[in-house]
């Protein structure tokens, strides 16, 4: 891409002065329209040292309302960031709907600067490029506009700018030893940039090369690129909104009852026989067997938890299942003897307004554990393909897309070294009814049952279909589903504890 770029392109001062006020005004207008339409925007600045990224960011945001954007300067990872998966620090910086996030440097640092400086191993590159593309695809398909700008200058121009910066005491600090080394090895560094651009130039997040030798030309091209991308996204958003409104109207006319719509969404495309229906729910332990196994496994979990911390291995454990299936009880027994400083239990409720304004995976990425710690989720990101699917809180396109998005996220966690386990706590309909009645009759447990639990029970078959498809599509070698026979609480709790300790022990041996 770079070898075909004409770096001699220029713009006269007069032409620049005449055009700038108009394009600044247009960008300000488009920012307001993106806000009104709830369009999140990410603008990524990458490029060679001294190509003018900071200067151009300053010019671009000059015409924007400062309440609607945030600039993120990306440098080497902090200690906290190093203890999380590679993309964690970028997920938590993604903008909410209607806001703009500007990145001075980005996730591309890992596959360019860090690669050049040997901090990224060559054998990791394929996975890193795949993770980056999946990250951008998820955000794009979720409605985020991603604009990627690469500021290009040649070796001589870069060297000239470095010398100019070094002449002034107040700007000397901006030229580092690393900058000088990359200038000396410009061709090697540029070749890595070429590969980065080639591997990550996609329809949903294309690169635009900015000829940055002439700063007036660069400023104008950046403005026009951002403006055109915003205009196109706004056009698509309006078209999609109109199409969705039309589709919803047709659905309402065709489907007399909401349950018909739900049944269509819940159609099982894999098999007529439910995976869950094959589960043997007769498994049980006596109280004495339970006590003996529980004490032994809890002591083992306590010991392994300390080993995890010392070897800096993160663990992600997700619990899904029927209401009253025993998720809370299993979590309590799992953590009872673990050091509370080393784990967090994340109860997942309906998203709040801030969470709704972000990609649905954003709130889960924020809660992912750092190395050596354990994150336990009481309900998880699988709500997208369960309750949101069945209750119509997301579109059919969105929940169908979510299987790949979730697999990609879990793959990123696994690549970062995490042990990932997902439990489906399974009981039959009669056992659920018995537990519901027990809760309603006991004043101390009545708070545990809600009207929503009773409504969900009426849709048992729909949830069972959705759970079957979820397990089939997202049980992987790196993030397996474990179906827990839960009619007997003693058996269920022991199975969870044994599965977790076995998985951790296996990983520790691999280290």
Where are the regions a protein language model picked out?
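Glycine-rich phosphate-binding loop of ATP-dependent small-molecule kinases
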Residues: 1-511
């Amino acid at each position: 891409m770079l070898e075909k770029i004409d770096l001699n392109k220029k713009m006269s001062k007069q032409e620049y002065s005449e055009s700038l006020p108009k394009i600044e005004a247009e960008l300000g207008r488009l920012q307001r329209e993106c806000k009104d339409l709830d369009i999140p925007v990410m603008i990524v600045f990458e490029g060679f040292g001294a190509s003018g990224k900071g200067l151009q960011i300053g010019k671009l945001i000059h015409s924007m309302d400062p309440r609607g954007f945030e600039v993120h300067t990306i440098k080497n990872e902090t200690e906290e960031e190093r203890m999380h998966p590679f993309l964690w620090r970028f997920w938590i910086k993604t903008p909410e709907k209607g806001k703009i996030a500007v990145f001075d440097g980005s996730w591309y640092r890992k596959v360019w600067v860090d690669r050049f400086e040997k901090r990224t191993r060559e054998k990791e590159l394929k996975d890193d490029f795949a993770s980056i593309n999946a990250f951008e695809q998820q955000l794009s398909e979720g409605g985020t506009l991603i604009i990627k700008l690469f500021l290009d200058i040649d070796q001589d121009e870069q060297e000239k700018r470095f010398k100019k910066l070094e002449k002034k005491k107040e700007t000397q600090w901006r030229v580092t030893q690393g900058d000088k080394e990359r200038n000396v090895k410009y061709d090697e560094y540029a070749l890595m940039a070429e590969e980065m651009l080639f591997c990550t130039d996609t329809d949903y997040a294309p690169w635009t090369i900015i000829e940055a030798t002439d700063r007036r030309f660069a400023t104008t091209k950046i403005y026009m690129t951002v403006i055109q991308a915003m205009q196109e996204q706004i056009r698509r958003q309006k078209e999609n909104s109109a199409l969705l409104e039309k589709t919803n109207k047709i659905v309402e006319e065709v489907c007399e009852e909401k349950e018909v719509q739900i049944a269509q969404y819940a159609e099982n495309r894999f098999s007529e026989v439910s995976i869950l229906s094959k589960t043997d729910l007769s498994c049980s332990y006596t109280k004495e067997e339970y006590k003996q196994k529980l004490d032994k496994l809890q002591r083992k979990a306590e010991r392994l938890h300390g080993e995890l911390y010392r070897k800096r291995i993160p663990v992600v454990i997700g619990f899904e299942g029927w209401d009253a299936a025993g998720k809370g009880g299993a979590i309590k027994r799992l953590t009872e003897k673990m050091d509370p400083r080393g784990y967090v239990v994340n109860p997942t409720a309906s998203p709040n307004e801030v969470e709704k304004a972000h990609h649905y995976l954003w709130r889960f990425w924020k809660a992912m554990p750092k190395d050596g710690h354990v994150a336990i989720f009481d309900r998880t990101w699988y709500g997208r393909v369960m309750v949101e699917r069945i209750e119509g809180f997301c579109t059919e396109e969105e929940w169908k897309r979510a299987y790949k998005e979730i697999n990609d996220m879990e793959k990123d966690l696994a690549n970062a070294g995490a042990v990932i386990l997902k439990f489906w706590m399974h009981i039959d309909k009669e056992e659920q009814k018995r537990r519901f009645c027990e809760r309603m009759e006991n004043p101390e447990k009545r708070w545990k049952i809600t009207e929503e639990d009773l409504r969900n029970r009426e849709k048992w078959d729909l949830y069972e279909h959705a759970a079957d498809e979820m397990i089939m599509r997202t049980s992987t070698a790196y993030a397996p589903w474990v179906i827990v026979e839960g009619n007997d609480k003693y058996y269920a709790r022991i199975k969870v504890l044994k599965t977790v300790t076995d998985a951790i022990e296996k990983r520790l041996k691999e280290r």
